[in-house]
């Protein structure tokens, strides 16, 4: 039993006090039990109550100075006065921080109390609710600072989210549940400000009550409520309570207390006495002797397990065997609030034994401290946290408290909740340190990255600040000099004025406003200023909603088209149809036309004529050899020198949204590593997509559906299929001789005359000369070469006029001296004679003549005398253009030898030609040799013809029996003259077959017969193309009969003019038998074939 005087001696033992340190909730703060304790007053009057950590019930009061109470009755007991009756602690007192009272007593020595004399820091001294001295006391009363109970079997559970709490670090939590708020206030009022904080497993749950033990993590912390205050989160919302918690140690949740638990009659809190209804009913006389009924320390530890015993305290178990009390839980008074609050049975989380001198632990702690130092160098806030921890650490060596070091590492890290909970739940110091080291290493990486980002941002900001400072100085200087405006305001106003005249779509207007607002806030010296200015300039240059009125007058269009071009009936008819639809509807949508034809037939120039007839603006660009997609779709704004694509440039140039855009040479687009421009044209030339064409530079949709696109190409084979499918193809065939004559007389000759300066000179170019040019110099299907020769004729004529008349006959016009003109117009310019040049010694300056005259006056044209007359005829034509290029139209004009036939070919320049086929044989091994720069297809045609002849050798009369072998001992050589010209295509099949039969039957073919057509292996004749050019070549060569496939008859009737077909007999065949009968008509072999190789029916004939 510990006598009463022992407590007095303990109260008199001095203890050094430590100053209270107040820190933020994120920094480590000292335990509320650490501030300097109050003196335990030994005044004669006040009574001291010794309480158990497990809710003890007061049995008897004893005065420490052994002074008996005054005798106020017969039984010697002093009845309790009204002002001396102890009441529960008010809420206001509980919210006051114990630190205020600790500060007032910080200079006084602390008293180290045992577990049996622990008093609550939130409770007042006995006899007064505000902690003052009771009436009649001789001096101020001081209360000893309590020791936090080591065992607290039952606590109020508070669920928390986001992060778990760690011992030694404050945390503020907000409670919104009214029952829980009431429970917290009850805890403070009863002097038991202790709760358990457990982390919710589901962070999305927002609850103040634990209904299931599996909702929270099994390991939490035992916390002391240091202060509380209420707050209103919003109008109409319930009041919330914010409580500041200080965790002391780790605890483990065992079970939830059910609502059927026993409710206590009263609870005595640490630091004060709260008497229940039963205790109030008892008189002071019923209280037994204090020393005889206080239980021993070991009994309390065994039965209740809630008393914290200091190692320096005397063994009270031996001196206080007779101390007994009634067992009740500390928070028995909260059972009435079940199940609206969560009460849990908990136990302390035990730590596995470890050795402080373990090399592993010391190594990990050393690494932790090293990482702490590295982070502290990068983050000043982190440095403050570590400093505060070092100050609050009670141990002189950090190696003595590895658990606190691990907790600090977890608190300052921004790790995942599961990782933090793992540190909290770990019972092994080594494992806890390992986990904390991992978290701190991650924090170091984040700190390094944050430091790098911060340093980069600071560098940029400093640069911008310096630029801004200099710009402000520049503005001030300009203001002093009267140059306040830097032009940006005028620029912005100009953009606004342009935009007000355009009908921008809503989306484009929004982008314009955003970019203009950005431009206003940018400095002109900034690099982004020019980028934004150029972008806004392009936005305002696009003709949004601006279009030109179209002319749908059909007669006017016919007049313009005929004035500019001769022929081209198909193209002109299509344009007139387009205008007729527009006249009926009142408006037309954009179309995509593709003009395909040989070079020089006027595909590009017809585009200009179409635009002129429709009254539209014209823009042309070529895609021949184009490899960059950006030329069509534009460049990204991030590139230096970026600009929109060709369609947007066209709209800017023509300043209207319905122009005619000519895309030249679409069959010559190339592919490269940076994309396929042909694929980029798909969006632009698709009527379903070009309503919202997206340029990479502007990055806003643009309507191209009103644009009339006209494309030109020489061949269709090289145009991608998807692109060709989006265009309406119009074939522009070559010109015949009559058409070339009209074009030369009406267009080419007058233009060449003006270009040569002979507009007023009497020069006559006779039609015979033009015809000779077409026949012997310019056989291509177009007129470009013809134009060159006519220009050459007029140049020669101009030179002849000047040389014949001489310099005296054409005197120079009177021109004032150049120097006088220059000096009069530009007085600041020095005369040429006064100009000086810096020349390096020992060198010469080429092209520098100090005496050279300069002038800005245009030269006057010379006047040719009226008597000059130049006449260009067929006879003197070679004096102007040289000897003829083509001497004769066909190689064999008379009866050719056996093995020769006449075919018709289509040349690469778009013209036709008469091509003889020559075959000869010699002793050999049955080989077939082909010469004449023949292509793969024409070689295959020769093989097919040879195979047909061998298979029908007996019927043709080449062999005497069907079993006789043919040509096994002879080689055959096939040649097509003009080997410099490449030849390709299947159309020479019938001519090659005829030449083979002529050679093997030793029968000649009439030279006035020409043929064309593809043959199959079984003798069928298939249609071919280029009939207009081939017939024109046959007409020019004087061919009398043409053998053509029957499938080509519609093409001949539609596209070949009558002037070309005149004098020619057309034979339309379907089988090679018909070809052979027609080519060898009237010969002996043909008569024999009527029996051995008869025709199924006579071929169709037409004579023109």
Swiss-Prot record:
Residues 155-444 form the Lon N-terminal domain. The active site is at 987, 1030. The keyword ATP-binding applies. PROSITE patterns: LON_N, LON_PROTEOLYTIC. The keyword Transit peptide applies. Residues 895-1082 form the Lon proteolytic domain. Residues 22-46, 104-128 have a biased composition (Low complexity). Residues 129-139 have a biased composition (Gly residues). It holds the Pfam family Lon_C. It is an enzyme of class 3 (hydrolase). One of its GO terms (molecular function) is ATP-dependent peptidase activity. Residues 80-103, 281-291 have a biased composition (Basic and acidic residues). Residues 1-58 form a transit peptide. ATP binds at residues 597-604. This is Lon protease homolog, mitochondrial. It comes from Cryptococcus neoformans var. neoformans serotype D (strain JEC21 / ATCC MYA-565) (Filobasidiella neoformans). The gene is PIM1.
